[in-house]
Amino acid sequence: MTQHFPTRQLRFFLTAPSPCPYLPERYERKVFAHLPLSDGATVNDSLTQVGFRRSQNIAYRPACEACSACVSARLPVTDYAFSRSERKVLARNEDLERHLVEAEATMEQFDLLRRYLLARHADGGMAEMTWPDYVAMVEDTAVRTHIIEYRTRPSDGGPGELVACALVDLMSDGLSLVYSFYDPTLGRRSLGSFVILDHVVQAGLAGLPYVYLGYWVRGSEKMDYKVRFSPIELLKAEGWTLMSSRDLRPKDELPGL
C-alpha cells in the first residue's frame, strides 16, 4: 500500500522498549512522528489509514520486535447491521442529548473522566492523569477535533447531567474515536457500547464510511470489546480486511467445536 504525504518529509522516531500495558510479560515499542501544524489533518488522515493513531500532536503505531498483536480496527458504516442487542442499547439511551462542543477541556469532563478511570482502569497508566494532562489530551491537536458530550435532558432549564464524553477526530473518510469515557455507575445503559454505536449512526448521517476504533489486541481483555462489533475491518498486511465477530473468536468458543 503506497501513501503520499502532502507535506515536507516527516521524521519518524522509535521509542525504547517499555512494559506492554495490554499483554503480560511483553514489551512494546512505538514508531512516531510529530504532526505538522500546517497540514496536520491531511497527514493524520493518511497515517491513520495505514495504522497510526493520534495522541495530542503525535501520530504513532506499534513497532514491537516480537509481537504483532495490536491490529488497527474500524467499522464500515455502510455495511454495518445493528444486532438486536445493539438496537436495544440505542433505544435505552434515546433520552440522552448529544452536544457537539469545541475541543476545550472542562472540569466537569475531567471529574467524569476521573470517576471512570478509578472504577474501570485503576491499575492503568492513565489512572494518574492530572488536570494539565487532560487539557493537553483534549486541546493539543493539529487536526479537526471536537468533543461529543452526552447529557440527560434538563428538567430545570439548565444543562443536563453529563454521563459520557467522546474525544473525536473528524477525518476525510470517517470519525476516529480518540478516547471515550462515561459514568461507571450507569451500567444498565451500556454507555461504552452506546458511544460507539451512536458514532456509527452519526457517521452514516454525515456520509462518512468509517468509524475508527484504534487497536484491537488479541488476548487482551481490555480490548476484546472491539471485536464484539460486527462486521469490522482489520488492517492486515494485504490491507483493510472485512471480518465478522465469528472469524475473531477462539475456536474453543465457537458452537460445535
From Swiss-Prot:
Catalytic activity: N-terminal L-glutamyl-[protein] + L-leucyl-tRNA(Leu) = N-terminal L-leucyl-L-glutamyl-[protein] + tRNA(Leu) + H(+); N-terminal L-aspartyl-[protein] + L-leucyl-tRNA(Leu) = N-terminal L-leucyl-L-aspartyl-[protein] + tRNA(Leu) + H(+)
Keyword Acyltransferase: yes
Subcellular location: Cytoplasm
EC number(s) per entry: 2.3.2.29
Enzyme superclass (EC): transferase
Chief place where the protein resides: cytoplasm
Single GO term (MF): leucyl-tRNA--protein transferase activity
Pfam families: ATE_C, ATE_N
Biological process according to GO: ubiquitin-dependent protein catabolic process via the N-end rule pathway
GO cellular component: cytoplasm
Keywords per UniProt: Acyltransferase, Cytoplasm, Transferase
Function: Functions in the N-end rule pathway of protein degradation where it conjugates Leu from its aminoacyl-tRNA to the N-termini of proteins containing an N-terminal aspartate or glutamate.
Similarity remark: Belongs to the R-transferase family. Bpt subfamily.
Protein name as annotated: Aspartate/glutamate leucyltransferase
Species assigned in the record: Phenylobacterium zucineum (strain HLK1)
Lineage: Bacteria, Pseudomonadati, Pseudomonadota, Alphaproteobacteria, Caulobacterales
Gene name of the encoded protein: bpt
